[in-house]
Amino acid sequence: MIKWTMINIYLLLMFLIIKNNNNNNNYNNITKYNKDMDLYSIQSPYIKNMNIIKRGYHTSLNNKLIIVQKDNKNNNKNNLEMDNFYKWLVGFTDGDGSFYIKLNDKKYLRFFYGFRMHIDDKACLEKIRNMLNMPSNFEETTKTIMLVNSQKKWLYSNIVTIFDKYPCLTIKYYSYYKWKMAMINNLNGMSYNNKDLLNIKNTINNYEVMPNLKIPYDKMNDYWILGFIEAEGSFDTSPKRNICGFNVSQHKRSINTLKAIKSYVLNNWKPIDNTPLLIKNKLLKDWDSSIKLTKPDKNGVIKLEFNRMDFLYYVILPKLYSLKWYSRKEIDFQLWKTTMEIYMKGLHNTTKGSNLLKLINNNINKKRYYSNYNISKNIIDDVLNMNTIYNYKLPYRMNSDIQRLNSMNNNNTKFINVGVFVYDLNNTLIMTFTGYRPAATYFNCSKHEIAKYIKNGNVFMNKYILKNILLD
């Protein structure tokens, strides 16, 4: 019985080997490169050597034969992680990556894809190399590091595959297209004269728009935005104004990219579920003006600015926190997140909070390069675990005004004489104003009428009660 079982196992394995060999013959029976190759296509003869998708399998043994089973759960998880990484990679490449061509001996084209970054960002490039199984070595100086690949077969089987499915969304889209087409023609044996070679090399990155080719902004996604942020984003703090800011910059020739980011965020990112109702209503009321484009500076650079604290805290921060980061920019984000927490809780009005903000300011953005990051978790936790000063149900600006006027009145125990608080007939706070004038403008009446209804306590406009204090 055992003998026949072993024979069955042997015959099964031989069948699988023969079948696999037949598949490999079909797999490699390709002579031309496909210009419209889909991601994970088996049409490329070179993709067999690359592990673009991590596949999870395990084997089990029963009484008669070996059964090969696919671990679908882990496989799906790995596929999703890799998909998200590819989207991130494209966004990061749109900001910091390069597609370019060099001439060898003035007659041979060499194709390159890669990154040149600060030496402190080596860990990021190591992640990219490992995730792609990129057969490349680092080139390092005391200040910079490069990760570049020039193996045409590998580039076609991997980079072209990824960027065809998840396209660039800046003007680099045109550079990639010209780079890819030149590579495909080169792989298919097309010959060029010296003039054509120079023309191909010099026009890859000339920022020329191709009228018959539209950048597919509808392909924008969360991870592309994150990758682009890690390349081109900046998390700012303003100690003098006690606010945080966030921006993404780009040359004016890619202004449509910034407009597309703005449109995508406003249409797809929403306040988190536990956003206090008053704040949520105000966010939705001012939604379209929450993100602004600046005018070009003297160098032609435009910024997409996110400056409203409540919008940053209840919309931008939670979304970015939910995504997987790959670069050192995550340190900036975490420090910025801590700063946001300090401000939103009003802890910048304490000595410990103020000191921590100064420490963070010396370690964020460009200051983190060549710096010894020495802010311990205990210091941060010690501040964030303090009792909250601000009322979490109120917008940040209102809390700031309350604190400022309380300080002026030397009274830190209750809120007095601050702005206008608007309640419905059930004493539910529904909106706030920083003073009589903005309330009067909103309700289209005089500030004296606002003052009168606050003083006499009568119902305003048949449905509101106006107060100049916050009810418990």
From Swiss-Prot:
SMART domains: IENR1. Keywords: Mitochondrion. SUPFAM superfamilies: Homing endonucleases. This is Uncharacterized mitochondrial protein RF1. One of its GO terms (cellular component) is mitochondrion. Signal peptide: none annotated. It is found in: Mitochondrion. Pfam families: LAGLIDADG_1, NUMOD1. It comes from the Eukaryota. The keyword Oxidoreductase does not apply. Transmembrane segments: none annotated.
